[in-house]
């Protein structure tokens, strides 16, 4: 299956279970980590035709998604005499995709890159849409750029080697899209165990279609694309205060979704039954839904480091009902604090 991301001169296709062989003019640098490289690098190299192939291996983990690692990638590209005709390939999950895209956007003012997402989270979300970047001490993804890939190859085979915890983390991002945009898709998660390859393929296809549609409408996140950050305003603070070590990104998003839903309940948007249904669906896929906040006031202040915060107004993405979103920039501080205190 193919999904077209129609962005005029930046258009590209997402290929789902269609990869056989890839021919690229010029040199190729594959960016991966030791774990993924050990599993899938040989498979990619065997089916890749180009001039020269370079392998750049970076440490595995969100804590390495920073400018230091980008500097290492750039140094290896320069020392290998790569140029503007070089194509980067991201072979890995969301961290690899984000860093490869960012490196491609700034190396000699921009070169091509292709995504081979090997995690469910990357296939349903991170690899599509051109958001690239790294974290710093002030927060997550605060340094980055919009740089669209030339193609994305989502192979179900990659998911066969994914640890169960990583798989569940990807499901959280998929449920996020269902709650925001598609009630029937949410019912799919209520009724599915995601044990069959057909169900998994259906989930990936639906998510890619939703993501592509949103990106086409709002490539640079000036409007509706911000809705894809549902759960993330809370999740990014959780990741930061736990130093990116306690939760996988999708797990933090799952907790963030539940926190956002409790805020929506307090504001009268969601019913108790809807909050319960979403929470139980997340739990069904072994995802966490709660986190003990050390201090509600300090947690609240960290919202201001979120990229969506503008003019000192925190932008909250909430569910108005399952399948319908609401963007709020004027929620009183005391209402948010009261919600956070429920998690203290």
From Swiss-Prot:
Pathway linked to the protein: Metabolic intermediate biosynthesis; chorismate biosynthesis; chorismate from D-erythrose 4-phosphate and phosphoenolpyruvate: step 2/7
UniProt keyword annotations, A-Z: Amino-acid biosynthesis, Aromatic amino acid biosynthesis, Cobalt, Cytoplasm, Lyase, Metal-binding, NAD, Nucleotide-binding, Zinc
Entry's transmembrane regions: none
Residues where Zn(2+) binds: 173, 232, 249
Catalyses which reaction(s): 7-phospho-2-dehydro-3-deoxy-D-arabino-heptonate = 3-dehydroquinate + phosphate
Residues holding NAD(+): 60-65, 94-98, 118-119, 131, 140, 158-161
Pfam families linked: DHQ_synthase, DHQS_C
EC number(s) per entry: 4.2.3.4
One Gene Ontology molecular-function label: nucleotide binding
GO process terms (BP): amino acid biosynthetic process; aromatic amino acid family biosynthetic process; chorismate biosynthetic process
GO CC terms: cytoplasm
Main localization (coarse): cytoplasm
Annotated localization: Cytoplasm
Purpose: Catalyzes the conversion of 3-deoxy-D-arabino-heptulosonate 7-phosphate (DAHP) to dehydroquinate (DHQ).
HAMAP family with a match to the protein in the record: DHQ_synthase (MF_00110)
NCBIfam families reported for this sequence: aroB
Name of the featured protein: 3-dehydroquinate synthase
């Amino acid at each position: 299956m193919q999904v077209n991301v129609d962005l005029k001169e930046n258009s590209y296709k997402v290929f789902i279970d269609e990869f056989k062989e890839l021919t690229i003019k010029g040199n190729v640098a594959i960016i991966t980590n030791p774990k993924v490289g050990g599993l899938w690098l040989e498979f990619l190299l065997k089916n890749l035709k180009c001039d020269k192939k370079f392998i750049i291996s970076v440490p595995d983990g969100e804590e390495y998604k920073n400018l230091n690692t980008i500097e290492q990638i750039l140094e290896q590209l320069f020392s290998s005499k790569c140029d503007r005709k070089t194509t980067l390939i991201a072979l890995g999950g969301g961290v690899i995709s984000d860093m490869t895209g960012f490196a491609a956007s700034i190396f000699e003012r921009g070169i091509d890159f292709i995504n081979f997402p090997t995690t469910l989270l990357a296939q349903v979300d991170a690899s599509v849409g051109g958001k690239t970047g790294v974290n710093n001490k002030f927060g997550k993804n605060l340094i980055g750029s919009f740089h669209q890939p030339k193609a994305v190859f989502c192979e179900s085979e990659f998911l066969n080697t994914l640890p169960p915890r990583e798989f569940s983390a990807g499901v959280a991002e998929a449920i996020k899209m269902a709650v925001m945009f598609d009630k029937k898709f949410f019912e799919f998660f209520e009724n599915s165990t995601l044990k069959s390859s057909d169900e998994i393929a259906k989930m990936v296809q639906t998510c890619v279609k939703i993501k592509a549609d949103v990106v086409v409408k709002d490539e640079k996140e000036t409007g509706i694309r911000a809705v894809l950050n549902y759960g993330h305003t809370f999740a990014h603070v959780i990741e930061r205060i736990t130093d990116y070590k306690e939760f996988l990104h999708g797990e933090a998003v799952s907790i963030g979704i539940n926190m956002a839903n409790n805020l929506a309940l307090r504001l009268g948007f969601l019913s108790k039954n809807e909050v319960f249904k979403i929470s139980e669906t997340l739990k069904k896929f072994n995802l966490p839904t709660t986190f003990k906040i050390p201090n509600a006031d300090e947690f609240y202040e960290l919202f201001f480091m979120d990229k969506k915060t503008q003019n000192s107004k925190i932008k909250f993405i909430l569910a108005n009902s399952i399948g319908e979103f609401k963007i709020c920039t004027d929620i009183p501080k005391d209402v948010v604090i009261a919600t956070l205190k429920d998690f203290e």
